[in-house]
Amino acid sequence: MSVIAQAGAKGRQLHKFGGSSLADVKCYLRVAGIMAEYSQPDDMMVVSAAGSTTNQLINWLKLSQTDRLSAHQVQQTLRRYQCDLISGLLPAEEADSLISAFVSDLERLAALLDSGINDAVYAEVVGHGEVWSARLMSAVLNQQGLPAAWLDAREFLRAERAAQPQVDEGLSYPLLQQLLVQHPGKRLVVTGFISRNNAGETVLLGRNGSDYSATQIGALAGVSRVTIWSDVAGVYSADPRKVKDACLLPLLRLDEASELARLAAPVLHARTLQPVSGSEIDLQLRCSYTPDQGSTRIERVLASGTGARIVTSHDDVCLIEFQVPASQDFKLAHKEIDQILKRAQVRPLAVGVHNDRQLLQFCYTSEVADSALKILDEAGLPGELRLRQGLALVAMVGAGVTRNPLHCHRFWQQLKGQPVEFTWQSDDGISLVAVLRTGPTESLIQGLHQSVFRAEKRIGLVLFGKGNIGSRWLELFAREQSTLSARTGFEFVLAGVVDSRRSLLSYDGLDASRALAFFNDEAVEQDEESLFLWMRAHPYDDLVVLDVTASQQLADQYLDFASHGFHVISANKLAGASDSNKYRQIHDAFEKTGRHWLYNATVGAGLPINHTVRDLIDSGDTILSISGIFSGTLSWLFLQFDGSVPFTELVDQAWQQGLTEPDPRDDLSGKDVMRKLVILAREAGYNIEPDQVRVESLVPAHCEGGSIDHFFENGDELNEQMVQRLEAAREMGLVLRYVARFDANGKARVGVEAVREDHPLASLLPCDNVFAIESRWYRDNPLVIRGPGAGRDVTAGAIQSDINRLAQLL
């Protein structure tokens, strides 16, 4: 087990802030506000040097050896900048103390420069901006009432000098643990970018070293999440400065992020992700200027990739070309060079392999090309090395992109007429790259983004359940399919119809208007495992499970559906009303994989009750109570029941008309109403268990088991009981209704109540549902939603509504 895997500090998080997030007084105060809102005591911060401090230090260092007057001017600019920051953020007495410490540092660094520059002096001077940032940020947090301490990472991070220094986890871990226990309950502000070698010298951690040190420190400290705050909200589908309709990606697979970083995207660096790969850390990218405007979370998700997620480009790349002599084995030479580059940790962005010309081409950014060329030159391999500059690169990144024929085709289409030097795809199929002889690439990236991401997506739909609701939805979908596609820009394909025993499946799509007729003749018996394998191998951009069953077995598969990247639209209430632990697991699984679980059809059929409750909560309201008639079936029964027809005969009529659940006892038992109440209460933000609801069942105990026919044949007891209750209510001038109630104190019940004839719950049309929402905003005059709450048409319409909503989310 690695040191990282052993580290453990449950709940602790780490926040990293870059130089642009600490550029001035306002920025520091904004960061302090973020820490107040988004962090807890014992959380950690890693900070970069403020603003352009690092560049100023490099300038000062270089000029100190050639132009002492200019060096002094840079030093004074740096001094004014840091002193202005300190004075603008702290009270005079505390500011004086920090300014004194800063001036002392500056004088010591100046003395170092006078004695000459070597690697150790360079690192000591250039890495000092982080020390000043951490010291000042700690003081600002304390001033804001957030107990904090600062920590110089050189006290525990151990790394030896190299082109890409690697932190020695074995040496660093115990040193950090000793320091962590010394500051209980405080936010620890740690310097980024710097470490120390065994000789006691400062070692810089290289390009993007602060981000790398943040994830490395987070892994050593055992944090649950590292959030990198910068001036962008996360990873976009393209550079938003080049592509105006680029969209923020809320979730990115770790392998996709790693490939994007390998391709030198500015928002990510490959070394930043190394500690994430070897630990259980979740990595989040967020904007410090607009923290509530979305983010990108990088996780180890199970959802299968189906194509490109990002297009990226570079307008300044180089090619190192190696001409293998005709007398040498070309494949052997390629293998040897590949091993040399891997050992030196300078992997190329792309490789051009030209067997016919005995030519190898290695693509690098201009910053890395000279180092790679030097490494290959020093290797002394037989052959000719040369460097070509001024080339460009475009790439598509996404798990499965090279296996997506549509995306590949559009990539090649966009490259037509372009000066392509060579194309390349990564071994794991996550990227497709083209190196161009000339740039710029902006118009090419715009066209590629438009072609890949705004073109029509194919959405596969698999319908589980072909009874009343399923058959009616098929009719509705057949009518609306073309309109839906035109409105959303997606192609919706009915890929399958499944019942409890058989399935009719086709990747090419089924005709919804004739699917049921074909089902009877062509459906085959299929076990659960083979059906699941068929679904996992789907060719669509997204697959949606439509669950219009009342099956517990299917509800139990929602976790698997989420983990394999399927969306679920449900009229089945069993998952939404399961115990809290299972319910949270399902919700978390869909959130983690970036898939959606929509269930508007579970309550109120087509009425927008779930949406309304969710909108009130999201807008800042608090739900105090919810009451009403939640069952269109029971609404119809109690409005029809006047004593002239036996109650069970009315139940039979409702069953024949498709107004009830497949087993009408599910309605009469109150379980269906209870599930709706639990779903609504949870939507309102309350943690309620199904067994907390007091339920009055109308099903006699001796009829709970057995067949439906047995229930209808033995309904005398229920009929007699209902007549007695009806007569008792009439004597008081009241009417009977089956009512559900829940309040903020956790009291919940469903059952028969006698209410006044002028009560909102009394004056209904048959099959109507009524929902009365009392909230902080609607305390004196409850918000009432009323309308048809049972029947095939309205429930099928609710399923269709959620398909529309899913299209918007996608």
UniProtKB/Swiss-Prot annotation:
<dbReference type="InterPro" id="IPR005106">
    <property type="entry name" value="Asp/hSer_DH_NAD-bd"/>
</dbReference>
<feature type="binding site">
    <location>
        <position position="661"/>
    </location>
    <ligand>
        <name>NADP(+)</name>
    </ligand>
</feature>
<dbReference type="GO" id="GO:0009086">
    <property type="term" value="P:methionine biosynthetic process"/>
</dbReference>
<feature type="binding site">
    <location>
        <position position="791"/>
    </location>
    <ligand>
        <name>NADPH</name>
    </ligand>
</feature>
<feature type="binding site">
    <location>
        <position position="469"/>
    </location>
    <ligand>
        <name>NADPH</name>
    </ligand>
</feature>
<dbReference type="Pfam" id="PF03447">
    <property type="entry name" value="NAD_binding_3"/>
</dbReference>
<feature type="binding site">
    <location>
        <position position="469"/>
    </location>
    <ligand>
        <name>NADP(+)</name>
    </ligand>
</feature>
<feature type="binding site">
    <location>
        <position position="672"/>
    </location>
    <ligand>
        <name>L-homoserine</name>
    </ligand>
</feature>
<keyword id="KW-0547">Nucleotide-binding</keyword>
<keyword id="KW-0560">Oxidoreductase</keyword>
<dbReference type="InterPro" id="IPR019811">
    <property type="entry name" value="HDH_CS"/>
</dbReference>
<dbReference type="GO" id="GO:0009090">
    <property type="term" value="P:homoserine biosynthetic process"/>
</dbReference>
<feature type="binding site">
    <location>
        <position position="573"/>
    </location>
    <ligand>
        <name>NADP(+)</name>
    </ligand>
</feature>
<dbReference type="InterPro" id="IPR041743">
    <property type="entry name" value="AK-HSDH_N"/>
</dbReference>
<keyword id="KW-0418">Kinase</keyword>
<dbReference type="InterPro" id="IPR001341">
    <property type="entry name" value="Asp_kinase"/>
</dbReference>
<dbReference type="InterPro" id="IPR042199">
    <property type="entry name" value="AsparK_Bifunc_asparK/hSer_DH"/>
</dbReference>
<dbReference type="Pfam" id="PF00696">
    <property type="entry name" value="AA_kinase"/>
</dbReference>
<feature type="binding site">
    <location>
        <position position="549"/>
    </location>
    <ligand>
        <name>NADP(+)</name>
    </ligand>
</feature>
<comment type="subunit">
    <text>Homotetramer.</text>
</comment>
<dbReference type="GO" id="GO:0009088">
    <property type="term" value="P:threonine biosynthetic process"/>
</dbReference>
<feature type="binding site">
    <location>
        <position position="573"/>
    </location>
    <ligand>
        <name>NADPH</name>
    </ligand>
</feature>
<feature type="binding site">
    <location>
        <position position="468"/>
    </location>
    <ligand>
        <name>NADP(+)</name>
    </ligand>
</feature>
<dbReference type="InterPro" id="IPR036393">
    <property type="entry name" value="AceGlu_kinase-like_sf"/>
</dbReference>
<feature type="binding site">
    <location>
        <position position="791"/>
    </location>
    <ligand>
        <name>NAD(+)</name>
    </ligand>
</feature>
<keyword id="KW-0028">Amino-acid biosynthesis</keyword>
<keyword id="KW-0915">Sodium</keyword>
<dbReference type="InterPro" id="IPR018042">
    <property type="entry name" value="Aspartate_kinase_CS"/>
</dbReference>
<dbReference type="GO" id="GO:0005829">
    <property type="term" value="C:cytosol"/>
</dbReference>
<dbReference type="GO" id="GO:0050661">
    <property type="term" value="F:NADP binding"/>
</dbReference>
<dbReference type="Pfam" id="PF00742">
    <property type="entry name" value="Homoserine_dh"/>
</dbReference>
<feature type="binding site">
    <location>
        <position position="661"/>
    </location>
    <ligand>
        <name>L-homoserine</name>
    </ligand>
</feature>
<feature type="region of interest" description="Homoserine dehydrogenase">
    <location>
        <begin position="464"/>
        <end position="810"/>
    </location>
</feature>
<keyword id="KW-0067">ATP-binding</keyword>
<dbReference type="GO" id="GO:0005524">
    <property type="term" value="F:ATP binding"/>
</dbReference>
<keyword id="KW-0791">Threonine biosynthesis</keyword>
<dbReference type="GO" id="GO:0004072">
    <property type="term" value="F:aspartate kinase activity"/>
</dbReference>
<feature type="region of interest" description="Aspartokinase">
    <location>
        <begin position="2"/>
        <end position="252"/>
    </location>
</feature>
<protein>
    <recommendedName>
        <fullName>Bifunctional aspartokinase/homoserine dehydrogenase 2</fullName>
        <ecNumber>2.7.2.4</ecNumber>
        <ecNumber>1.1.1.3</ecNumber>
    </recommendedName>
</protein>
<feature type="active site" description="Proton donor">
    <location>
        <position position="676"/>
    </location>
</feature>
<comment type="pathway">
    <text>Amino-acid biosynthesis; L-lysine biosynthesis via DAP pathway; (S)-tetrahydrodipicolinate from L-aspartate: step 1/4.</text>
</comment>
<keyword id="KW-0808">Transferase</keyword>
